[in-house]
Amino acid sequence: MAAAAVARLWWRGILGASALTRGTGRPSVLLLPVRRESAGADTRPTVRPRNDVAHKQLSAFGEYVAEILPKYVQQVQVSCFNELEVCIHPDGVIPVLTFLRDHTNAQFKSLVDLTAVDVPTRQNRFEIVYNLLSLRFNSRIRVKTYTDELTPIESAVSVFKAANWYEREIWDMFGVFFANHPDLRRILTDYGFEGHPFRKDFPLSGYVELRYDDEVKRVVAEPVELAQEFRKFDLNSPWEAFPVYRQPPESLKLEAGDKKPDAK
């Protein structure tokens, strides 16, 4: 019954619209609402504009952190997108992270990401990056430190529990050792994997390849074999529309090793 009532009202609206336009010399057209995009969407900037007020506030807070922890803070900078970066000594991981988490003017209680960057040309090739978030002040900060292949860095699990699996991933991918980690083992690669794939000196082909051996009924690891003595690229394909125009028959015979017949 409700559907029938709605249909009757809709039909009455059509008849009413046609009656209004009758006798005016114009065709009876039912105008339907059209959804239009706002004009402001086209003029909206695609890049975040520079906020000078926020830039000054972040610079002042960075200087404040450097004054309180001068032993560990080595450099403070604000990026063009108003992101504060603090570069610290490797010995200051725990003190700096604890300060940023507990201080009244910081309250960076969330570790949103922890990663590493490999720059082989540097003496300390690995850069460890901590990205922190303060919900209290709606602000972010990036803490950077450095290490090499042999020097361990203090684990941040005692400050942020979320650093547990992040540090395992860095150990697995880059080979950076975190001291005092509760369970530092590989997390992405397979058991017995050799090397660390995210290092710049790691070969693209890897060191071993895995395959299923039907004789032993299990997956086995073997050295990578990519060498080929001879590779012949046959450009003719039966799936092409005009395969005969790809290469003349004479060149095919010459490629196969036949001698060119003497011209008579």
UniProtKB/Swiss-Prot annotation:
InterPro entries: NADH_DH_suC, NADH_quin_OxRdtase_su_C/D-like, NADH_UbQ_OxRdtase_30kDa_su, NADH_UbQ_OxRdtase_CS. GO terms for cellular component: mitochondrial inner membrane; mitochondrial matrix; mitochondrial membrane; mitochondrion; nuclear body; respiratory chain complex I. It is a peripheral membrane protein. Its EC number is 7.1.1.2. This is NADH dehydrogenase [ubiquinone] iron-sulfur protein 3, mitochondrial. Gene3D superfamilies: NADH:ubiquinone oxidoreductase, 30kDa subunit. It comes from Homo sapiens. Core subunit of respiratory chain NADH dehydrogenase (Complex I) which is composed of 45 different subunits. Interacts with NDUFAF3. Interacts with RAB5IF. Found in subcomplexes containing subunits NDUFS2, MT-ND1 and NDUFA13. GO terms for biological process: aerobic respiration; mitochondrial electron transport, NADH to ubiquinone; mitochondrial respiratory chain complex I assembly; proton motive force-driven mitochondrial ATP synthesis; reactive oxygen species metabolic process; substantia nigra development. Core subunit of the mitochondrial membrane respiratory chain NADH dehydrogenase (Complex I) which catalyzes electron transfer from NADH through the respiratory chain, using ubiquinone as an electron acceptor. Essential for the catalytic activity and assembly of complex I. Keywords: Disease variant, Electron transport, Membrane, Mitochondrion, Mitochondrion inner membrane, NAD, Oxidoreductase, Primary mitochondrial disease, Respiratory chain, Transit peptide, Translocase, Transport, Ubiquinone. It catalyses: a ubiquinone + NADH + 5 H(+)(in) = a ubiquinol + NAD(+) + 4 H(+)(out). One of its GO terms (molecular function) is NADH dehydrogenase (ubiquinone) activity. Signal peptide: none annotated. Changing residue 140 to W: In MC1DN8; uncertain significance; decrease in enzyme activity; impaired assembly of complex I. SUPFAM superfamilies: Nqo5-like (SSF143243).
